[in-house]
Curated annotation (Swiss-Prot):
The gene is Tada2a. This is Transcriptional adapter 2-alpha. Residues 70-122 form the SANT domain. Zn(2+) 1 binds at C17, C20, C42, C45. It is found in: Nucleus; Chromosome. A zinc finger (ZZ-type) spans 12-69. InterPro entries: ADA2-like_ZZ, Ada2/TADA2, Homeodomain-like_sf, Myb_dom, SANT/Myb, SANT_dom, SWIRM, TADA2A_B-like_dom. Residues 426-435 bind DNA.
Length: 443
């Protein structure tokens, strides 16, 4: 450890030569018999046979150099120390600048070596960096490898999602263009000098105070965006769509007051009104049962089934008004009757239109190169191809349905359709797939 600890790219970090007091440059000599403190000599003093007090020129010695591997055969000890110093200077994750400072390794090599030996190998890290914690590190958990986060997302520059996020840069937690982006222009020509009059000095100070107030407004807006989670606009809209239409209208109205209260209080207010709406709807349903003389839920299920049957029969009875429109035209009347007969036989109107028009069904969607494809398994890829849904949208819909199912303890198809407002047939296929694969459960 002493040997490794003496290696550094900065000569001033090493002890000076005992002969000429110059900074030591590798390789240099360490006397094996003198010390402590250690007795170091540069090559010039060693070749002259320098002697000092108890040190004699015939003492045994060691050649101090860092040109040997420690952890990896392709990495020398000097490169190991240079890597640690570069990470300390440039910051973890800034591998391009780390590689530029080292000059001998690429950024991929630096990242791979550092993650392998200093992040994912806690036993070695504790042994090398802190011997006192070696015993405790034997029972320590394995370090978690670094993975980039998906929330907020990191879209490509100038993409549609990047424009939706107003140019937000997640790595810097800042925007490309600030609110009131040209506020600094008012200060570019201001210069405080001793010859300024009192009025001119007060005027300049007033401009600075105005600039400070504009900075405070900029920070206030940033805080509102971050606290309320408004950066990821798509996720925010999905969360809003899980409410019924009446609650969505309230959500839209109360959005302007979100800046006054905190995010937790605002969410509690909306959730409480959503719960109130559900309770009112449930009370109305129970009152309908009581009016009909129903006193148990078993009878209520029979009542709902019969009510649905009556509604369907009522809709069928209105067909008489439709056929009366064609009573004067016999050919049109026969065509309408044939269409109704096909519908009664089990064919949907969409199938009839497709068969009449002769149109072909849309081909499966090609997922090659689409973002998010690598996150899908084979069954999910097949679903996206058949439904013609891009992987990114499918992952957002899946996450929204999973969260709602976990929150409610189950999910109905009607709730899924209210949550993801796309084609109802696509929603049904996604819902059936998630049920079949065990991702969600029916309510």
């Amino acid at each position: 450890m002493d040997r490794l600890g003496s290696f550094s790219n900065d000569p001033s970090d090493k002890p000076p030569c005992r002969g000429c007091s110059s900074y030591l440059m590798e390789p240099y000599i360490k006397c094996a018999e003198c010390g402590p403190p250690p007795f170091f000599l540069c090559l010039q003093c060693f070749t002259r046979g320098f002697e000092y007090k108890k040190h004699q020129s015939d003492h045994t010695y060691e050649i101090m150099t860092s040109d040997f591997p420690v952890l990896d055969p392709s990495w020398t000890a000097q490169e190991e120390m240079a890597l640690l110093e570069a990470v300390m200077d440039c910051g973890f994750g800034n591998w391009q600048d780390v590689a530029n400072q080292m000059c001998t390794k690429t950024k991929e090599e630096c990242e791979k070596h550092y993650m392998k030996h200093f992040i994912n190998n806690p036993l070695f890290a504790s042994t090398l960096l802190n011997l006192k914690q070696a015993e405790a590190a034997k029972t320590a958990d394995t370090a978690i490898p670094f993975h980039s986060a998906d929330d907020p997302p990191r879209p490509a520059f100038d993409s549609l999602l990047s424009r939706d996020m107003a140019g937000y840069m997640p790595a810097r937690a800042d925007f490309i263009e600030e609110f009131d982006n040209y506020a600094e222009w008012d200060l570019r020509d201001i210069d405080f000098v001793e010859d300024d009059s009192d009025i001119l000095h007060a005027l300049k100070m007033a401009v600075v105070d105005i600039y400070h107030s504009r900075l405070k407004e900029r920070q206030r807006r940033k805080k509102i965006i971050r606290d309320h989670g408004l950066v990821n606009l798509r996720k925010f809209r999905l969360m809003e769509r899980r409410y019924p239409k009446e609650v969505q209208d309230l959500y839209e109205t109360m959005r302007r007051f979100a800046r006054i209260v905190g995010p937790v209080e605002h969410d509690k207010f909306i959730e409480s009104h959503a719960l109130e709406f559900e309770l009112r709807r449930e009370i109305k349903r129970l009152q309908e049962y009581r009016t009909a003389g129903i006193t148990n839920f078993c009878s209520a299920r029979t009542y709902d089934h019969l009510k649905k049957t009556r509604e369907e029969e009522r809709l069928k009875r209105t067909m008489l008004s439709e056929v009366l429109q064609y009573i004067q035209d016999s050919s049109a009347c026969q065509q309408w009757l044939r269409r109704q007969a096909d519908i009664d036989s089990g064919l949907s109107p969409s199938v009839l239109m497709a068969s009449n028009s002769g149109r072909r069904s849309a081909p499966p969607l090609n997922l090659t190169g689409l973002p998010g494809t690598e996150k899908l398994n084979e069954k999910e890829k097949e679903l996206c191809q058949v439904v013609r849904l891009v992987p990114g949208a499918y992952l957002e819909y899946k996450s929204a349905l999973l969260n709602e199912c976990h929150k409610q303890g189950g999910l109905r198809l009607a709730q899924a359709r209210a949550l993801i407002k796309i084609d109802v047939n696509k929603t049904r296929k996604i819902y059936d797939f998630l049920i079949r694969e065990g991702y969600i459960t029916k309510a």
